[in-house]
Amino acid sequence: MARAKLKFRLHRAVIVLFCLTLLVALMQGASWFSQNHQRQRNPQLEELARTLARQVTLNIAPLMRSETPDENRINAVLRQLTQESRILDAGVYDEQGDLITRAGESVNVRDRLALDGKKAGSYFNQQIVEPIQGKNGPLGYLRLTLDTHTLATEAKQVDNTTNILRLMLLLSLAIGVVLTRTLLQGKRTRWQQSPFLLTASKPVPEEEEREEKE
């Protein structure tokens, strides 16, 4: 008798631990889902940035066709591009790679690209280089530095979404427990005939037999 009772308790403990493991996995899955959604946005933002860069090169190309590029008008376009945006700096180079003009943050290109090994700020920067096309080949190049750092408000939104998903999982678990206890209260079902339970030897009457007895 004691051995059967011990088996029953072990069986129940294994089921409870298995359910708790599944619950933890689901809650971690909710966190992974939110983070994966955030990661999927990065390629989309990069594609939008490249589309913007191509559009800017079309506007700059007429200013680069003369022997002396119009630095003032090119700089005006770059200033408008970098003003209050996620584009930290922008620069235009000739076909030989020499700088013509730039706008935005006054950070050295070597420091921006972390060529000297200082990567403190470069982790959140992304470089985009787009050629400025002419009739006979590239007239120059446009370089943009994007700020890919996640703002505090965006990170908070991701955390809120994760917490909402976890709360929904916990509510689903609570509803399942309440429904199970309500529907099966005082009622023996066929799962109770498991060889690990003490009631396994007692047959479960069919529903029709119960109705006839009543």
Curated annotation (Swiss-Prot):
Cellular compartment(s): Cell membrane
UniProt-listed Pfam families: SMP_2
Q: Which GO terms describe its cellular component?
A: plasma membrane
Signal peptide feature range: 1-30
Q: Which UniProt keywords apply?
A: Cell membrane, Membrane, Signal, Transmembrane, Transmembrane helix
Topological type in the membrane: Single-pass membrane protein
Q: Keyword Cell membrane, does the record have it?
A: yes
Its transmembrane ranges are: 164-184
NCBIfam families from the UniProt entry? PRK11246.1
Family assignment from sequence similarity:
Belongs to the Smp family.
In Swiss-Prot or TrEMBL terms, this protein is called: Protein Smp
- Gene name of the encoded protein: smp
